């Protein structure tokens, strides 16, 4: 069986990885300009296909049958070729509902605010309505409720983002701040790249129930497989594929004192895990055309930190990397937020007597090193998801990190 995904821009899609992880059929990504959609619908090369932005409504007139849920939502994201024409379905409903259930988010009796008024907003509205929401309000750029009068919705209890704001490569932006919603107790964001958007990061910092969109993507793909080939993919298999993909795309971030071995451990971990390792100090040196000590000497620490922030935030946007940071990178809260968006942070601990002080502009003596550790240790500890002792060999430390990642929560 030959299946595909059609859309306008699919360069960063995870759909091929997800569908082929189920092992039921081949799956291709087909980027199409709008004027080619009609020809694709009539071409019988693919037995079934998914549809993403901006064609979920475009394909509907070509379908001889549209399922009740697709009619209710007003969009089709799954099409199957049959003997009597194209049949259209919507599996986003199942995916969104599954994401909310996994996060323990219940809509019954809740005041729900949905950011965005596009096709995915319709899906969120349908799920929240069927779940018994007390009130559902849609926020758009020019509607009665817009981003300039969010204070009118301060009683929001469940916030849902269906806009692309905060999606790669524009990580770090958010359609709204949770500061506007003091009574908010749950957040859902359909964006899956990065794993944790700025909005989800705000929810995590407040201890609010939340979920990014990757689980929705996997769950809706599983439901699509049901229509493609009558496959019944259960929750355990959905969880397996979700977890495997999340671990693969998540960055491994190493933080800690200057000279604690982050770069060396990253290189060993790269060999063990088959991932690319990058060092943010090296990225700074490449962009500046001079060494870190030279940057400090000629331009001072402030300029170095500016270059470092660019390097850290650029690397943090990517997926599946091992990122060895400079000792002071996490002093900037913006860097920490960027790294956490798509990564798991490990605090690499090492006895101060074992630290290398070569070419370390800010830790040239034991006295300055002790003061630095006293100031930075709480910062490293607070930003890290796990702490790993690096007093043994770099190979053993790398193996510890690999093992911890495999057993970590997503």
Segments and roles (model prediction):
Residues 2-103, 194-196, 200-202, 206-209, ...:
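Phosphate/diphosphate ligand-binding glycine-rich loop within oxidoreductases
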Residues 7, 90-93, 100, 109-129, ...:
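Glycine-rich adenosine-cofactor-binding loop
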Residues 145-210, 329-335:
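Rossmann-like adenosine-cofactor binding region
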Residues 191-250, 390:
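Adenosine-phosphate binding glycine-rich loop
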Residues 239-245, 268, 272, 344, ...:
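NTP-dependent small-molecule kinase module
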Residues 262:
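Conserved lysine of the Walker
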Residues 279-340:
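ATP-dependent small-molecule kinase phosphotransfer cores
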Residues 341-379, 386:
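A glycine- and Lys/Arg-enriched "phosphate-lid" helix/loop adjacent to the NTP-binding pocket
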């Amino acid at each position: 069986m030959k299946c595909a995904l059609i859309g306008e821009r699919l360069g960063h899609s995870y759909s091929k990885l997800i569908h082929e992880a189920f092992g039921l059929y081949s799956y291709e990504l087909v980027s199409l300009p709008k004027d080619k959609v009609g020809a694709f619908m009539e071409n019988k090369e693919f037995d079934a296909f998914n549809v993403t932005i901006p064609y979920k409504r475009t394909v509907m007139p070509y379908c001889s049958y549209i399922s009740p849920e697709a009619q209710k939502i007003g969009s089709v994201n799954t099409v199957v070729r049959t003997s009597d024409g194209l049949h259209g379905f919507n599996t986003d409903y199942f995916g969104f509902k599954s994401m909310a259930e996994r996060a323990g988010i219940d809509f019954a009796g809740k005041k729900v605010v949905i950011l965005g008024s596009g096709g995915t907003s319709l899906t969120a509205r349908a799920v929240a309505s069927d779940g018994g929401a007390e009130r559902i309000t849609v926020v758009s750029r020019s509607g009665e409720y817009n981003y300039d009068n969010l204070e009118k919705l301060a009683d929001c209890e469940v916030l849902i983002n269906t806009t692309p704001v905060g999606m790669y490569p524009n990580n770090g932006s958010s359609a709204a701040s949770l500061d506007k919603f003091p009574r908010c107790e749950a957040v859902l964001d359909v964006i899956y790249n990065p794993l944790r958007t700025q909005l989800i990061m705000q929810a995590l910092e407040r201890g609010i129930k939340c979920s990014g969109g990757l689980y929705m993507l996997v769950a809706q793909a599983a439901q699509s497989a049901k229509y493609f080939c009558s496959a019944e993919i259960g929750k355990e298999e959905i969880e397996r594929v979700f977890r495997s993909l999340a671990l693969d795309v998540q960055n491994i971030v190493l933080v800690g004192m200057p000279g604690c071995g982050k770069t060396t451990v990253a290189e060993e971990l790269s060999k063990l895990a088959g991932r690319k390792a990058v060092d943010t100090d090296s990225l700074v040196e490449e962009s500046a055309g001079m060494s870190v000590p030279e940057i400090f000497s000629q331009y001072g620490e402030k300029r170095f930190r500016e270059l470092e922030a660019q390097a850290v935030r650029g690397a943090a946007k990517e997926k599946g990397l091992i990122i060895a940071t400079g000792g002071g990178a996490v002093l900037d809260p913006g860097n920490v937020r960027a790294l956490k968006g798509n990564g798991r942070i490990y605090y690499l601990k090492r006895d101060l007597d074992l630290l290398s002080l070569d070419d370390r502009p800010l830790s040239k003596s034991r006295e300055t090193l002790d003061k630095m550790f006293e100031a930075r240790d709480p910062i490293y500890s607070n930003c890290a998801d796990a702490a790993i002792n690096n007093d043994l060999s770099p190979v053993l430390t790398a193996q510890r990190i690999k093992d911890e990642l495999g057993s970590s929560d997503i």
